[in-house]
Each structure stands twice: as structure tokens, then as C-alpha cells.
């Protein structure tokens, strides 16, 4: 809807531009008349704003589009080939770099393994090198911003990761400042689960189904991103949604966060793999060997290997406890579960989670809830990191 009165003219212009470009991004391609209908802005206002975007090279005209009345209109789309952003996802074992247009289309994606012995300083240098390399490979493209998604609680004000379980050297490391020094364009950092949650919202053309959403990242660690009315809920320090560090056993083992019995100590890909390896060393029968890979584990679960299946279902049971706690705390309309635990056996995980969550909820709450798994073509964390960078530019493109 158009911007209301009570703000100065310059701010009203900025907000109207942001409204128009975001509507065009969600539609992919549409006419000036369609933009006027979608935004409730006057046709003259749309014409002026689109004219500015075309002069900037941000928007281009395309082929004629057919309308319901039979009249043809010139199509418009964001010039994603010229204006792009980069997203980076950091995990405990690898990092990925994606290059997307401002409207979300993917142009390049590369992943790099993180050697076990590498320190955080050298890891940052490695990422800088490969990002600069990706930028240099496309001199005709202008990279507008870079978004990074990091595991663990990210302290926004300090620009630091508080800690990452099973990974040393990150505590109080000034990653935001280090990365900002390396690039002369805006650099944005977010928690990985927040990035994934934002991806589920940003890439949804209508933005309606996922406006109140919990996205659970179930991979090498456990975290969640919270969306309320389309906005990330981050808390006072930016660490809201750390489901992995909620206790499911107050007599449980001590966690690196200081708590006891944290969900992440019972449920994650790393925990699953370690439990299976311990049982293999004790001589239990399985089609897996002690040096199994994640792909081997997925195949063992698919084949119904008793050991792999038992431990996977055990992981899912712990995950259910965390999910039910989230439902009772935040009352989301949609819960999306993604990352490596899901990738192992998406249909099985979804069935187990739905069955067990339903048993733990009142019928009225269950009936208003949608639980799904993320099987997107691209990893939602890296895509969310890029989306956050893109949205920053789109909210005020003339400032960059």
C-alpha cells in the first residue's frame, strides 16, 4: 500500500521506490499498470519511479505482456545480470559462496571444504580470496553487497560470534570488522537460522504463507530463525531463537554455552554420527563402517539398516521436544525444518515429527499449524544470506 502522510518528501520517495522495486522483484516480470494495482500508487508515480530505475540500469523493459482486456503492455524486470549480490554460508566443515541477481536468480555457487586444522584468521582469508575471485570472474557485473550467515549466536552490536560448539577460535573474534575491512561494499552478517528463515519468506512470491514462521536449521548444530509479520525476531542482542541451547534435561551434560542438557547435545548431525560410530566400535552390526560418510548414512537409513534407523529416529524424537517448546512459546503458523538432518531422510523425518508433535499438542493448536521440510534446490542458509544483502540494496538503491 502507498506510504501515508506524516513523513518528509524524501523519505516518502524512498519508501515508494522500495515498495515498487520489491513488488517487481516478487512478480518477476510485470507491467507498469500491474505495479500500480499491486502498490496502490498512482500511475504517474509508477511512471516516474520506473523511469528513475531504468536510467539507473536497475530495471529493464522486456517483451510485451498480454492483459485481461487484450491490450498489450511493456514488461518490466529487475536487471539481475548487471546488479548482483553475494551470499556466504559458513558451517563447521565447509563454506559456500553464491552470486545472485537482485531479483534472486542464481548465477554462480561454489563450496569449499574447511581443513580441520585451519584457524579462524586463515578461514577468513580463504573466504576473502574466493569471494574476490568470484567477483573478478564477472567484471561486467556490479556486486552491490555481501551477506554472511554464521553458525552459533551472532552478537550484532559487537559484530562477533559468541561461540560455536565443536569449533574453537571463534569466541569474541571480530569477524564483522575483519570482513568489512576486506571489501569496499556493504557487508552484512546474520545467524544461519535467521538467514534460512528469511529465505523462506523472501523467495515466497506472495509473502503470505510464511509471514509468521519458525525455520529450524537441523544440521551440524541446531538453531532456529523466527519471523513475525515478515520481520526477523532477533532479540536485544541478536541471539533470539537459539533452540539448540534450550535445556531438555536439567541434569544433562554441561554445554559450551554454560547451560546443561542442551538440545544440541542430543540432536544434530554430529551427535547422530558420533553415536553410530560409538556403537560400531562396540561391535554392533550395521551395513556402515567406522569411516562412513554422510552419504553412506543416508543410504543406510533408506535401506532400513537397524542401527542407522534407530539412531535417526532417536534424533528426530529429541527434535520434536524442541519443536513443541517453540510452538508453545511462539505460536507460529508454519514450521520449516531444513539442513543436513532433513537431507538424510526428508520423508521419514517429516512423518515422525508430524506424528509426535501432534501427540503433544491440543487439537486446536495442531489444526492451525503447518509443518514442512525444506527441499529447496539451493541451500536456504546461503540463499538467505544473499537475500538479506539484496533486500538491503533494494530498500534504498540510490544510496549505493
For the regions a language model picked out, list residue spans one by one:
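Glycine/GP-enriched mid-protein hinge/lid loop-to-helix segment characteristic of carbohydrate kinases
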Residues: 109-111, 119-123, 171, 180-302
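Short, active-site-adjacent cap segments at secondary-structure transitions
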Residues: 153-156, 194-197, 223-224, 233, ...
